[in-house]
Amino acid sequence: MDKLTWYGHGAMGLELGGHQVLVDPFLGGNPAASITPDKVPANFILISHGHGDHVGDAIAIAKRTRATIISNFEIANWCQAQGAPTTHAQHLGGGFKHPFGYVKLTLALHGSALPDGSYGGNPCGF
C-alpha cells in the first residue's frame, strides 16, 4: 500500500510501489521531523529548489542509501559535485518514468540559491 509521511516543513517521505521517495529532506535541525537523516530510508530524493531548508540533508542521505537525487539540471549537477552518487536531471515541463512513477517538473515561483550561494536554477514542483 502506498503511504505518505510528513516530516515537517516541506519534507515528506513517500512509499510508492515498494520504493522509498523523499521530497525536500530537511530533517536535521527541523524541530518537526520525526526521523533523523541517519535513519530515514530512501531510494530516490526529489529536490524542488536550492534553499537549505529544502536541499537539507539530501547529500548525506544519498551517500548513505545510494539514493538517486532527482531535480533540475543545476541542482542535480551541484549535488553530484557535493558527492551524491547518482543524480537524474530534468527540465521544467519535461517528465520521466522512474521505477516508482512518472515525475514531471512544473514551474514554481520562488528563489533557488543553493546553500553555498551558487545558482540553483528554476525552482520546481513535482
Sequence positions of predicted segments:
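Extreme N-terminal starter segment of soluble prokaryotic enzymes
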Residues: 1-5
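Catalytic core of the metallo-beta-lactamase
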Residues: 7, 12-16, 97-126
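Short, polar loop motifs at secondary-structure junctions
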Residues: 8-9, 71-77, 91-93
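Pre-active-site segment of Zn-dependent metallo-hydrolases
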Residues: 13-51, 56-63, 74, 111-119
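Catalytic phosphate/metal-binding cores of nucleic-acid and nucleotide-processing enzymes, i.e., regions
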Residues: 44-46, 68-70, 82, 87, ...
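Mobile, glycine- and charge-enriched loop segments
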Residues: 63-69, 122-123
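Histidine-/acidic-rich catalytic cores in large beta-rich domains
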Residues: 86-91, 104
